[in-house]
Amino acid sequence: MKVGVIAGGISSEREVSLRSGQAVFNALKELGYDVVFIDAGIDLCEKIKIEKIDIAFLVLHGGWGENGAVQGMLEVMGIPYTGSGVLASALAMDKEASKKIFLYHGIPVPPFKVLNKKDYISSAVSLSSFSFPCVVKPAEEGSSIGVNIVKNEREFKNAINEAFQFGKRVIIEKFIEGREIHIGVLGDKALGGVEVRPKKGFYSYEAKYTKGLTEYILPPEIDNALYEKLKELGLKAHKSLNCKGGTRVDMIVDQQGNPYVLEVNTIPGMTETSLLPKIASLAGYDFKGLVKEILELSLKNNEK
């Protein structure tokens, strides 16, 4: 069986994807698999044909690598792949769609509004309808790219303009003061969680991928009942989108202990600072064991 590790891509998360892909490639190599590294570009389909892979291990972050497009291409080609399917990938990447599904399933999310670029440009939206502080983010980006916490109208306008660089819709969320906790899910099990405490600001792109900028509390220092509730909520969010394989569910717990789900990441980072490998260690998985389990889950799903 020949495994193709597909990473890189052309999204704003390319560099992180390459680092994740290299780590996965090295692990599969050490596990004895016949493996090839494929840097995804517009010629991805041709590269896959040339390499004649039997299964794709997807480590693409953002853009068409995580929004269902590559997954759909692989299905047309008849090649199984790791992680979530076309629809689940598309829904998870679209923050507006996923939030509405979470609400339908009784999963709490921060109060939010959606701002369309055409309405904003035409001044059809009154900024006075938004209260501060709030979180402004692109509707379809990951790794906290284009995300800002804003405290006044001037910051709001700058944040909106930045977020619109990444798409035609922007999510504006109520800012929840609290603890940021991430739950790892593998297959149909919640592995555990980690609390992240950025040393400055919020858990930004820089804080996520730069050593020393974030403190990781593993497992979170919370009472056991709340921890179990968060794990149940993480698994419920994963299942509500019909996700497969390994995912990471991001949450905020407010000062009263109320949890809010922010998003589900269908292809979490697999770098040395990434959260899913840290969380998986709580369930007894080292990095190679996690990679092997993700691959084996996709093979089992493909057999069904």
Swiss-Prot record:
It catalyses: 2 D-alanine + ATP = D-alanyl-D-alanine + ADP + phosphate + H(+). This is D-alanine--D-alanine ligase. Keywords: ATP-binding, Cell shape, Cell wall biogenesis/degradation, Cytoplasm, Ligase, Magnesium, Manganese, Metal-binding, Nucleotide-binding, Peptidoglycan synthesis. GO terms for molecular function: ATP binding; D-alanine-D-alanine ligase activity; metal ion binding. InterPro entries: ATP-grasp (IPR011761), ATP_grasp_subdomain_1 (IPR013815), D-Ala_lig_Van_CS (IPR000291), D_ala_D_ala (IPR005905), Dala_Dala_lig_C (IPR011095), Dala_Dala_lig_N (IPR011127), PreATP-grasp_dom_sf (IPR016185). Its cofactor is Mg(2+); Mn(2+). GO terms for biological process: cell wall organization; peptidoglycan biosynthetic process; regulation of cell shape. PANTHER family: D-ALANINE--D-ALANINE LIGASE (PTHR23132), D-ALANINE--D-ALANINE LIGASE B (PTHR23132:SF23). Cell wall formation. Belongs to the D-alanine--D-alanine ligase family. Residues 99-296 form the ATP-grasp domain. It comes from Thermodesulfovibrio yellowstonii (strain ATCC 51303 / DSM 11347 / YP87).
